[in-house]
Amino acid sequence: MSYAALKAVPSASEATALLSAGAVRARCANVSEAVRRGETRYFRLVSNRLDEAARRVVDVTRRRYPDLAVPYHSRWRHFSTGGFDRAALIARGADTTETARARIDLAIVSVLLDAGAGPRWRYHEAETGQVLSRSEGLAVASLRAMQTGLFSADPATPWRADAEALALITPESLARAFQHAAGNELVGLEGRALLLRKLGEVCVRSPALFGVPARLGRLYDHWSPGDQPLSANEVLGTLLKAFGAIWPGRISLAGVPLGDCGRHPAAPGDGLVPFHKLCQWIAYSLIDPLQAGGLRVVELDGLTGLAEYRNGGLFLDCGVIAPRDPDLLQYPLDALSEPVVEWRALTVTLLDELAVLVRERLGKSADDFPLVKVLEGGSWVAGREIAFERRRDGSPPLAVVTDGTLF
């Protein structure tokens, strides 16, 4: 074998380098610059339309948070939908440490169940009488499922997610908890159940992170020793390495599973473009329970915007991202296909650019108004609102085929 051939073999360190938010930002920038130069096949950028997207985000932010006291974009906002403080139910009467563990348990499981529910699904919450759909419905359904002890092997302590119970999750048990039925179909049940079972398996294999017996909330104990602040990138790095094996049928490099990662010819080397949407959504959603548990989480802007259909849909519906062929938006696309990778990469890059414009218009600095607040204020809601303006069912402008483990 030649020296050149030896050099072409990817190493585990090259693979591990892709397991970071920095790699997401850099590889997405590679693709976005190629789009700006007109070198890609599927989309073009109409940069002067970014002002319209920023205007919408600013208007939504001022309407939702008139005092601009915007909380972090996280799963916790969904748990309080309808004005009910459901988070107050979690591990009532427990001490600070156990409450932090229980909230981490819920955040991780709930985010992993947060892939698109489909347009027909609704959750009827008996306790409040609310009928909820999409992300809010999935959040509340997951909280109520945990309240019943679905994710706990100990009937006496339902507010926990441990490996033993996760290993027993089936599509049928999720269907019951999430009220899946004819006419009320929740898409991706098989994929969701498989994801949780695999989650239980990786917890057992990592006792240093999840303890013995293995429990998701033990991550709090892993991160809590010492007085040093915890960076958001450190949180994400732990999640990516711990959960890499749970994603079904994804790309591996040098034996390292890369999780939420696609390919695009504009990216260097093997053309790999990581996004790590769900793991970053978990990382954002762990900030609140970690801080409530006494930890200081810093460098929040080290994480990226989330490459999903509300943020990405905002840019498509505002005309910032324009398909070269309008017919591209007329039929479902595979989640790992080149046009979807291109669209998601543009979304990550444009969210950083959008954040600058939003801060300028709100009179805020990056320290006062990090990206996580732009998302919450925010781009996600603006993306949903314009989707309902354009399409009666609020569906995204680009349809992506999902197995319940990506979007």
Residue ranges of predicted features:
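Extended, well-ordered protein cores
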Residues: 2-293, 299-327, 331, 338-407
